[in-house]
Amino acid sequence: MSLSLWQQCLARLQDELPATEFSMWIRPLQAELRDNTLALYAPNRFVLDWVRDKYLNNINGLLNTFCGADAPQLRFEVGTKPVTQTLKTPVHNVVAPTQTTTAQPQRVAPAARSGWDNVPAPAEPTYRSNVNVKHTFDNFVEGKSNQLARAAARQVADNPGGAYNPLFLYGGTGLGKTHLLHAVGNGIMARKPNAKVVYMHSERFVQDMVKALQNNAIEEFKRYYRSVDALLIDDIQFFANKERSQEEFFHTFNALLEGNQQIILTSDRYPKEINGVEDRLKSRFGWGLTVAIEPPELETRVAILMKKADENDIRLPGEVAFFIAKRLRSNVRELEGALNRVIANANFTGRAITIDFVREALRDLLALQEKLVTIDNIQKTVAEYYKIKIADLLSKRRSRSVARPRQMAMALAKELTNHSLPEIGDAFGGRDHTTVLHACRKIEQLREESHDIKEDFSNLIRTLSS
């Protein structure tokens, strides 16, 4: 069965759609053309419903373009295409090859050994999972800032080694990347208790490799890491400038992908922005799906505080949660740390948790936050980021090169300060509060539509909150 028709559709869709959308929703589909019906198989119901709702017209339009009146009927199903041949290919290939004579690679069974660190005799490796059972999808608070990352992680947990391999999550400190890594690990092991799932910080990989070299046990090291079912590595940016570690990880990465074993990586920045890491590795990081996690919006911050308080059997008034969330914006870890401090103070003093009590308990933290983020600082940072003058932000100029940064700065001022809309308008050349409101709504809309605007907003939030 030729997949040339679906290959043509894929090529056009890849040109028409943003790279993230294509990787997230179109690449996982498998196609089968039979009896003038093109069946598209989605890995789960979530992907099927999304593709049918968002891309049905695009796909039907392409079928009509390529086939005219002979265009096949389109059918969606959950599952995998019926297999008539056995063939393993690297997951980054968009479609399966049509040849049937290629031999399937066989994974070599690891030789026996009794444990990793003591190495004398070959044996089945003893796997250190290191997955934290407390971090699950159930206690991960979802919002706009992390919705796509959570959905992708959930799909990986349901179908490890499938479409999103590798999965690369990136974002600032304390935004939930590590939580999602553990959640995936727990999800995989819940479905398959004997799965070999290994979570680790990238520095542990380096330490293990150094130990293996010192003990003349590099083959055992390779066997250990290349025989896992899922490898979850946190903070991959720490591989920077470690050439031997990168070399070893490069070969481990290739071996795992060829074996359809799942890889999930996290970093504090976009793969191509990681300095000191080889281009061939950065290229492979993007073979699957790359998803950003942004700082949580106000509603999500409130939900995080309420859920954390509930886990501690603490009644947290809604207005208090809102007060804290409005003033602490940078990351989840900071929010949880502030709440723990409030709870501890309340336990020590026996006082009720009120806004006045929180203001007192977090006095130094709130003062520091207000000192760090001001409208003047936002204007200066945005002007430097877009390479314009602060005077341009305050001017009446309406060219896009000035208007868009001005809207961005206004939206950031609303997000990161406690100033009212009229106060923000005054700070931007005496503009009306409705202008500020329009700017905020425009940036919110563009963040949904434009990857570049979304990245700009995240980068500026990270800079201003650090």
Swiss-Prot record:
Residues 86-129 are annotated as: Domain II. It is found in: Cytoplasm. Residues 347-466 are annotated as: Domain IV, binds dsDNA. Residues 1-86 are annotated as: Domain I, interacts with DnaA modulators. One of its GO terms (molecular function) is ATP binding. Its main location: cytoplasm. Residues 130-346 are annotated as: Domain III, AAA+ region. It comes from the Bacteria. GO terms for cellular component: cytoplasm; plasma membrane. Keywords: ATP-binding, Cytoplasm, DNA replication, DNA-binding, Lipid-binding, Nucleotide-binding. GO terms for biological process: DNA replication initiation; regulation of DNA replication. ATP binds at G174, G176, K177, T178. HAMAP family: DnaA_bact. Domain I is involved in oligomerization and binding regulators, domain II is flexibile and of varying length in different bacteria, domain III forms the AAA+ region, while domain IV binds dsDNA. Oligomerizes as a right-handed, spiral filament on DNA at oriC. Plays an essential role in the initiation and regulation of chromosomal replication. ATP-DnaA binds to the origin of replication (oriC) to initiate formation of the DNA replication initiation complex once per cell cycle. Binds the DnaA box (a 9 base pair repeat at the origin) and separates the double-stranded (ds)DNA. Forms a right-handed helical filament on oriC DNA; dsDNA binds to the exterior of the filament while single-stranded (ss)DNA is stabiized in the filament's interior. Belongs to the DnaA family. This is Chromosomal replication initiator protein DnaA. It comes from Salmonella gallinarum (strain 287/91 / NCTC 13346).
